[in-house]
């Protein structure tokens, strides 16, 4: 049997149960070994973070299933959470994480790119409302929001302020 990323993805999707979902999968096949890296998404958690217990449970169940593929399939399995500062999937995560802080890479008038902190507002059509976030003024009520075309956002991450 050929052990492909697609075979492994199908197995993972059978093992996962809501509210857990597959966030990302990377499989690195070497001569007699595969490195399988899985990131989980927790669909009902505020930041989408899967717990350590969730990761352990999924890891155990996947290992049991992968062990049934036979001794000739040697693998290393790593299961983790996508995390509280995960990469955003645009545009869907802009809706999902509305109200949270994000670090977005956005264009400046000069044509250069800049990473800035924003609080996500509502998505309307092809634009999202963003409130520039400044730690010094975070409690002021008169912070101005801007509407930015989603297509202009190069990339982003959730941002966790501690």
Swiss-Prot record:
Keyword Transcription annotated: no
Biological process (GO) annotations held by this record are: ribosomal small subunit assembly; translation
> What name is this protein filed under?
Ribosome maturation factor RimP
Q: Which UniProt keywords apply?
A: Cytoplasm, Ribosome biogenesis
Homology family: Belongs to the RimP family.
Q: What does this protein do?
A: Required for maturation of 30S ribosomal subunits.
Note the InterPro entries from the entry: Ribosome_maturation_RimP, RimP_N, RimP_N_sf
Q: Which organism is it from?
A: Leptospira biflexa serovar Patoc (strain Patoc 1 / ATCC 23582 / Paris)
Q: Which GO terms describe its cellular component?
A: cytosol
Sorted alphabetically, which NCBIfam families does this protein's record hold? PRK14635.1
Disulfide bridge map = none
Per its UniProt entry, which superkingdom is the organism in?
Bacteria
Query: Where in or outside the cell is it found?
Result: Cytoplasm
Major location category of this protein: cytoplasm
